[in-house]
Amino acid sequence: MNTVRVTFLLVFVLAVSLEQADKDENRMEMQEKTEQGKSYLDFAENLLLQKLEELKAKLLEEDSEKSRNSRQKRCIGEGVPCDENDPRCCSGLVCLKPTLHGIWYKSYYCYKK
């Protein structure tokens, strides 16, 4: 009976020690995989961040070009004298010689088209 107990105890101790070794090995393996996964995630995150910054810069550049091109510079309103050679009338207006009123000024004025 004693030999059975000793044998059982020996097998039990051996099983527990092997199980502990397997757990440690598995834990180390999982830790390595996690670290590798983090490095891959960091790389992917940096790559995505660079692409987003490039897109943002491109969009801001296009917006600034649009606003620069669409914005009207200082212009002359309707009924205001303008220069025939350099008309700065606002959009929808043209620099014309006045008919009837204002002929005595010998100047051009901005009128609607």
From Swiss-Prot:
Per the entry's comment, what about the domains? The presence of a 'disulfide through disulfide knot' structurally defines this protein as a knottin.
A Pfam family recorded for this sequence:
Toxin_22
- Name the chain's protein: U11-theraphotoxin-Hhn1a
Predominantly, its location class is secreted
- Family per UniProt? Belongs to the neurotoxin 14 (magi-1) family. 01 (HNTX-16) subfamily.
The compartments listed are:
Secreted
UniProt note on tissues of expression = Expressed by the venom gland.
Q: Does the keyword Calcium apply?
A: no
Question: Which domain of life, per UniProt?
Answer: Eukaryota
Q: Which interval of the chain is the signal sequence?
A: 1-21
Example of a GO cellular component annotation carried by this entry: extracellular region
Naturally occurring in which organism (per UniProt): Cyriopagopus hainanus
Propeptide feature ranges: 22-74
Question: What keywords are assigned to this protein?
Answer: Disulfide bond, Ion channel impairing toxin, Knottin, Secreted, Signal, Toxin
Q: List the disulfide bonds.
A: C75-C90, C82-C95, C89-C110
Its function, per the record, reads: Probable ion channel inhibitor.
InterPro entries this protein is in?
Toxin_22
